[in-house]
Amino acid sequence: MSDVNKTVQKWHASFKKGTDFDSWGQLVEAIDEYQILARQLQKEVQSSNSHDFTEEQKKTLGKFATCLEMRSAALQCTQSQEEFKLEDLKKLEPIIKNILTYNKDFPFDVQPVPLRKILAPGEEENLDVEEDLDAGTGAGSTPSFTSRLPGSLLPRLPSEPGMTLLTLTIEKIGLKDAGQCIDPYITVSVKDLNGIDLNPVQDTPVATRKEDTYIHFSVDVEIQRHLEKLPKGAAIFFEFKHYKPKKRFTSTKCFAFMEMDEIKPGPIVIELYKKPTDFKRKKLNLLTKKPLYLHLNQTLHKD
């Protein structure tokens, strides 16, 4: 069997897995499977080096990815009627199974899913509000999107005599709807009292495990300045972000922060606050009254 046939077989198996989860009512697993397959198809469509598929076939794969995203969005939107039903999605099985020979018109009037856009800090909150306002009227246009890289964590700085470095292990975050979050990651930044960056901003990779009300990261973040060199009033911020397929952008769901007097070796849990992220720490509103927090572990390195 050729590589391209193996790829198609793998896609078909993934599609079957997703629709099976969907029909069994295992919606979180179905959403995850649909999202994984949509990413794989998008990657193939966007690859300029791939010659396994014709341009027409790539266009069909792009439309297929759109339908997967639409079904994912429908499963997450419990307030309204499903926009894209499971029986509609199942009609597409012959396409993914026989993409190399499929030559009929695509059964639904959809466009290939656009590339994702990564928004500048604060921009996602503005767009979030605009999208919410537009949702009722159908107004607004879809932005273009570019793929997000899998994390941007930096290595530990070289040690200096008498200076202290901090490693923060992000263990997990507690959220009541943890299982519904798509491609969750955390942006870590260090700000002064005026909200100005003191260090390079770092993104964790996307979390790999969800369990009950927790999303597990288990990832080390190296703070990019010796603690003795941080100004008075500085704080370390953690912005929890996730992808919204219906709105097609990455949004900040909540944030947390640590002040300098909280830096000490060992575990710590910190409270979660509602967006938009308030880097100046003036107007803080707790995300929930439930005992859900960001769980960290701190390691200090001193020569």
Swiss-Prot record:
<dbReference type="InterPro" id="IPR036818">
    <property type="entry name" value="AIDA_N_sf"/>
</dbReference>
<dbReference type="GO" id="GO:0009953">
    <property type="term" value="P:dorsal/ventral pattern formation"/>
</dbReference>
<dbReference type="InterPro" id="IPR035892">
    <property type="entry name" value="C2_domain_sf"/>
</dbReference>
<dbReference type="GO" id="GO:0048264">
    <property type="term" value="P:determination of ventral identity"/>
</dbReference>
<dbReference type="InterPro" id="IPR023421">
    <property type="entry name" value="AIDA_N"/>
</dbReference>
<feature type="coiled-coil region">
    <location>
        <begin position="25"/>
        <end position="51"/>
    </location>
</feature>
<feature type="domain" description="C2 Aida-type">
    <location>
        <begin position="154"/>
        <end position="301"/>
    </location>
</feature>
<keyword id="KW-0217">Developmental protein</keyword>
<dbReference type="InterPro" id="IPR025939">
    <property type="entry name" value="Aida_C"/>
</dbReference>
<dbReference type="GO" id="GO:0035091">
    <property type="term" value="F:phosphatidylinositol binding"/>
</dbReference>
<protein>
    <recommendedName>
        <fullName>Axin interactor, dorsalization-associated protein</fullName>
    </recommendedName>
</protein>
<comment type="similarity">
    <text>Belongs to the AIDA family.</text>
</comment>
<dbReference type="GO" id="GO:0016020">
    <property type="term" value="C:membrane"/>
</dbReference>
<comment type="function">
    <text>Acts as a ventralizing factor during embryogenesis. Inhibits axin-mediated JNK activation by binding axin and disrupting axin homodimerization. This in turn antagonizes a Wnt/beta-catenin-independent dorsalization pathway activated by axin/JNK-signaling.</text>
</comment>
<keyword id="KW-0175">Coiled coil</keyword>
<dbReference type="GO" id="GO:0043508">
    <property type="term" value="P:negative regulation of JUN kinase activity"/>
</dbReference>
<dbReference type="GO" id="GO:0046329">
    <property type="term" value="P:negative regulation of JNK cascade"/>
</dbReference>
<dbReference type="GO" id="GO:2000016">
    <property type="term" value="P:negative regulation of determination of dorsal identity"/>
</dbReference>
<dbReference type="GO" id="GO:0031333">
    <property type="term" value="P:negative regulation of protein-containing complex assembly"/>
</dbReference>
<feature type="region of interest" description="Axin-binding">
    <location>
        <begin position="151"/>
        <end position="218"/>
    </location>
</feature>
<feature type="region of interest" description="Disordered">
    <location>
        <begin position="133"/>
        <end position="156"/>
    </location>
</feature>
<dbReference type="Pfam" id="PF14186">
    <property type="entry name" value="Aida_C2"/>
</dbReference>
<feature type="compositionally biased region" description="Low complexity">
    <location>
        <begin position="147"/>
        <end position="156"/>
    </location>
</feature>
<dbReference type="Pfam" id="PF08910">
    <property type="entry name" value="Aida_N"/>
</dbReference>
